[in-house]
Amino acid sequence: RHPSRDKLVQLCFGMRLDETKASELLERGGCAALRPYVRRDVIIAFCLNRGMDISACDDLLWGLGEETITARPRDRRV
């Protein structure tokens, strides 16, 4: 069984990876790399490349109307 993409993204933040290394980890974990045509992925890449922590990235995602990384399913924005 593979971890979810969001779990792998959380790991990327914990390991302080940049966009390139994060995409590699996602692919090795059986998920799609960060995609430049997906708004949420662009925001995540922006945060990773600037060394932001996961809570700051979640705040930015929420503020821009995107699904956060650490939200539980019932808390996710529709």
Feature-to-residue mapping (PLM):
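A short, structured loop/turn motif at beta-sheet edges
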Residues: 15-19
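Short amphipathic recognition helices of helix-turn-helix/homeodomain-type DNA-binding modules
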Residues: 21-54, 58, 62-70
